[in-house]
């Protein structure tokens, strides 16, 4: 993949995820010396690209699953993405030098509570699961010699077992409250998840000094916020 600077060729573009992770990321962004323009905090704004207190830097706000794609294909130089997304897409153009320590959760297999007491994951040979993460799921089970049939869903995963779509799901779990509310329990943990700083590898080469400086700024921001 070739880095494409597009419009605003000299500006650094940072891709941030919408939703819960954005709230956790903003203290790091501010500790790194950036404040977005006022419309960034306007809930009625449909704007997706924002200027910042640094005239050399813009922020874009996109779906969490899209951050890795924007960075890998050169639409942004730097981003914040969970290692779940990084591993799912497995883009060769993504460099993830820093664990930001935010967005902590886990990717797990869950099934109906009534089945879990008698079920032994170690004896599975073929399973059907609903998941947003078919690639991670297939790789995980293939490593154990288990054939995983993955039904790709983008949401409402917890409904799938109750409606007969599949017996198990693979999804992100934080407190486990959503699983419990839908009669599901975790039966196997696949991956611990946190958000990482991701950098476009080509940008890292052609703007090496600048990218290295930003990585260090975010490293210092993590230390400052954690202190």
UniProtKB/Swiss-Prot annotation:
EC main group: transferase
Gene Ontology cellular component annotations, sorted alphabetically: cytoplasm
Keyword tags: Amino-acid biosynthesis, ATP-binding, Cytoplasm, Glycosyltransferase, Histidine biosynthesis, Nucleotide-binding, Transferase
Function statement: Catalyzes the condensation of ATP and 5-phosphoribose 1-diphosphate to form N'-(5'-phosphoribosyl)-ATP (PR-ATP). Has a crucial role in the pathway because the rate of histidine biosynthesis seems to be controlled primarily by regulation of HisG enzymatic activity.
Family matches, as HAMAP family: HisG_Short (MF_01018)
Family the UniProt entry places it in: Belongs to the ATP phosphoribosyltransferase family. Short subfamily.
EC number: 2.4.2.17
Biological source species: Rhodospirillum rubrum (strain ATCC 11170 / ATH 1.1.1 / DSM 467 / LMG 4362 / NCIMB 8255 / S1)
Highest taxon listed in the record's lineage: Bacteria
Domain notes from UniProt: Lacks the C-terminal regulatory region which is replaced by HisZ.
Pathway(s) of this molecule: Amino-acid biosynthesis; L-histidine biosynthesis; L-histidine from 5-phospho-alpha-D-ribose 1-diphosphate: step 1/9
Subcellular compartments: Cytoplasm
Subunit details: Heteromultimer composed of HisG and HisZ subunits.
Gene3D superfamilies, A to Z: Periplasmic binding protein-like II (3.40.190.10)
Name used for this protein in its record: ATP phosphoribosyltransferase
CDD domains noted in UniProt: PBP2_HisGs (cd13595)
Gene transcribed to yield this protein: hisG
GO molecular function, one term: ATP phosphoribosyltransferase activity
Keyword NADP: no
Record's catalysed reaction(s): 1-(5-phospho-beta-D-ribosyl)-ATP + diphosphate = 5-phospho-alpha-D-ribose 1-diphosphate + ATP
Keyword Mitochondrion among UniProt keywords: no
GO biological process terms held by the UniProt record: L-histidine biosynthetic process
């Amino acid at each position: 993949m070739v880095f494409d600077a597009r419009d605003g060729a000299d500006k650094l573009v940072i891709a941030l995820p919408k939703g819960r992770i954005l709230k956790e990321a903003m203290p790091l962004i501010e500790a790194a010396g950036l404040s977005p323009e006022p419309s960034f905090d306007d809930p009625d704004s449909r704007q997706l690209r924002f200027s910042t207190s640094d005239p050399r830097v813009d922020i874009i706000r996109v779906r969490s699953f899209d951050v890795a794609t924007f960075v890998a294909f050169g639409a942004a130089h730097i981003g914040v993405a969970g290692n779940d997304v990084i591993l799912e897409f497995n883009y060769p153009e993504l460099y993830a030098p820093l664990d930001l320590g935010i967005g902590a959760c886990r990717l797990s297999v869950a099934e109906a509570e009534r089945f879990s007491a008698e079920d032994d994951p170690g004896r599975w040979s073929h399973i059907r699961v609903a998941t947003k993460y078919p690639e991670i799921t297939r790789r995980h089970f293939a490593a154990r010699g288990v054939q995983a049939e993955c039904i790709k869903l983008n949401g409402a995963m917890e409904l799938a077992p109750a409606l007969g779509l599949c017996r198990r799901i693979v999804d992100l779990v934080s407190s486990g409250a959503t699983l419990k509310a839908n009669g599901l329990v975790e039966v196997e943990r696949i991956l611990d998840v946190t958000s990482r700083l991701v950098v476009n590898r080509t940008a890292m080469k052609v703007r090496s000094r600048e990218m290295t400086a930003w990585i260090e700024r975010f490293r210092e921001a993590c230390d400052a916020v954690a202190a």
